[in-house]
Swiss-Prot record:
Its main location: membrane. GO terms for cellular component: membrane. It is a multi-pass membrane protein. Pfam families: MFS_1 (PF07690). InterPro entries: MFS, MFS_dom, MFS_trans_sf. The chain crosses the membrane at residues 81-101, 115-135, 153-173, 203-223, 235-255, 309-329, 348-368, 394-414, 422-442, 444-464, 485-505. It comes from Aspergillus flavipes. MFS-type transporter; part of the gene cluster that mediates the biosynthesis of talaronoid C, a fusicoccane diterpenoid with an unprecedented tricyclic 5/8/6 ring system. Keywords: Glycoprotein, Membrane, Transmembrane, Transmembrane helix, Transport. Glycans are attached at N21, N71. Residues 1-42 are annotated as: Disordered. This is MFS-type transporter tndD. Belongs to the major facilitator superfamily.
Length: 538
């Protein structure tokens, strides 16, 4: 990537998704000299690297600069990833932990509406769709840590507000805002991992991070069922507030800023104070005003979604799978209480089938993902130096896509004929394997392909999947009432079968789609005076 001072052209790196060990990739934008200069001399200030041909440009102090997030100590990386992963577990946990207590809630507020009973759960996921539109670009403008802190505090506050709600309208409103602020770790966590972890080691880390969005909604109803039965539905929110408050405190104590652009900006400001040279600027500074950068950051996720066919296709596929998960979650309580006469406390245990399947898929995919990447990126006669491509993350996705329809058919017809309760739960386990394959592989793919803009790419993905996750459960009960459990789940299974070619097409044609896609359609929105070259994202 280069920024030429003479013509103010911003170039997006064609190696944007490659090894995060490259400081230029991590920082996002690098400087190259004018065409008539063949050599570049460097002045080492001890705090940064300043190019002699661009004497006011501040860069990293070489590839081993300890200020570069990829060079942070192992302890700092583990601490940051651990806290973010914990947050990414808690906020999805809150999406479904409340579900077993809904019958108590509806009785207390004197409502018998099945629609409202489903919506009071899914409105949280709707908040997950709205929050990323602001939070992801804000993290790329202000940094990761301020967004985490603000959202953690607000999540805790709205959890308390939910516990104190006195009517259904209040609870729905507070649940929505709880979801909006709870989306921060899910949206920005992938960006934090991209900041810290080099590409060839990223698959295993994302496997840990993916536990939250997949297992949180599964474990939530198990704990929530017993808690609601013992102490009432309000205590679900009190527990969330207590845990959220503890994580907020840990974040303030230990979480460290990782976004390279913000860190370079801070270095520049520190150098200005030390040297008195007000002409110094970060190599990422393209001269835009704060307003222009804000507009750029806010609009970027939607542009990525609508202008990048690979992001659009992957987001729709993840959205369908995510919607299926929440549709099934919204019906588990009724299915197993009505069909199998499970008590409220035990009904939550039926969610464990999906959890066990997700864990099994997590261990397998986490073990093979980085191995596949390294094996496929070995040097060949065509590519003597080897090449790591985002598409190398996708083979497990192709395998996992078959588990989703198989699990749906098994769950639907076994529950319809009231076979032993373990059979439909095994079916949900197969769906869980497919879910984790889809979520992990596509998250890794987007992080590898967009790196410094990973938060915006994941935000686009999160918006689509959260909208479907909120809307499909609202239609689920009506579908089951009219079609029955057998044909209702079969309809979902047939749709999943139709979607199987999507991951296959992404793996086979994804690189070609990225190369054909003109990166300027995303990045030229920054400013009328800044033009962007094509990015192949390879």
């Amino acid at each position: 990537m280069s920024l030429s001072g003479s013509d103010s052209h911003l170039a997006v790196s064609p190696t944007l998704a490659e090894d995060m060990n490259s400081s230029d990739t991590s920082a996002g934008l690098a400087e190259t000299p004018p065409a008539d200069e063949e050599k570049r001399s460097i002045v080492d200030t001890g705090e940064s690297v300043v190019a002699m041909n661009e004497p006011h440009i501040v860069d990293w102090d070489g590839p081993d600069d300890p200020g570069n997030p990829v060079n942070f100590s192992r302890h700092i990386k583990i601490t940051n990833v651990g806290i973010v992963s914990a947050l990414t577990f808690i906020t999805p946990l809150a999406s479904s932990m409340f579900a077993p207590g809904v019958p108590q809630l509806m009785e207390e507020f004197h409502s018998s509406s099945r629609l409202l009973a489903g919506f009071v759960v899914s409105v949280y996921v709707l908040g997950f769709a709205i929050g990323p539109l602001i939070l992801a670009p804000a993290s790329e403008l202000l940094g990761r840590v301020p967004i985490y802190h603000i959202c953690n505090i607000c999540f805790t506050v709205f959890s308390i507000a939910c516990a104190l709600s006195t009517n259904l309208g209040m609870l729905i409103a507070f649940r929505f805002f709880q979801g909006c602020f709870g989306s921060a770790p899910v949206t920005n966590g992938g960006g934090t991992i991209a900041d810290l972890i080099v590409q060839e080691k990223r698959g295993g880390v994302i496997a840990i991070y993916a536990l939250g969005p997949l297992l949180g909604p599964v474990i939530g109803p198990v704990a929530g069922g017993y808690l609601a039965a013992a102490r009432g539905w309000r205590w679900v929110f009190w527990v969330l507030a207590i845990v959220g408050g503890g994580c907020t405190l840990a974040s303030f104590l230990f979480l460290r800023e990782t976004y390279p652009m913000v860190l370079l900006k801070r270095k520049t400001q520190r150098l200005i104070q030390e040297t008195g040279n007000t002409h110094l600027r970060s190599k990422n500074d393209n001269g835009m005003s704060t307003r222009q950068r804000f507009v750029q950051a806010i609009v970027r996720p939607s542009r990525i979604l609508f202008r990048s066919p690979i992001v659009a296709a992957s987001s729709v596929y993840v959205g369908i799978v995510y919607g299926y998960q929440y549709l099934m979650f919204s019906t588990f309580t009724y299915v197993f209480e009505d069909q199998y006469a499970f008590p409220t406390s035990s009904a939550g245990l039926t969610f464990l089938g999906t959890g066990v399947g997700s864990l099994l898929g997590l261990f397998v995919i986490g073990a093979v993902s980085d191995r596949i990447l390294k094996a496929k990126s070995k040097p060949t006669p065509e590519a003597p130096s080897g090449a790591m491509k985002p598409e190398y993350r996708l083979p497990p996705l192709v395998w996992g896509a078959f588990f989703i329809p198989a699990g749906l058919f098994m769950y639907g017809w076994s529950a319809y004929y009231r076979t032993h309760w373990i059979v439909p739960i095994i079916g949900t386990g197969l769906v869980g394997i497919g879910n984790i394959a889809v979520f992990m592989c596509i998250t890794s793919y987007l992080v590898d392909a967009f790196t410094i803009f990973a938060a915006s790419a994941l935000a686009a993905n999160t918006v689509v999947r959260s909208i479907l996750g909120a809307l499909l459960p609202m239609a689920g009960q009506s579908m089951y009432d009219s079609m029955g459990l057998g044909w209702g789940n079969s309809l979902l299974g047939f749709i999943a079968v139709v979607c199987i070619p999507i991951p296959w097409a992404m793996m086979r044609y994804g690189e070609r789609m990225r190369e054909a896609f003109d990166g300027a359609t995303i990045f030229t929105i920054f400013s009328g005076s800044v033009s962007v070259t094509r990015s192949t994202f390879t």
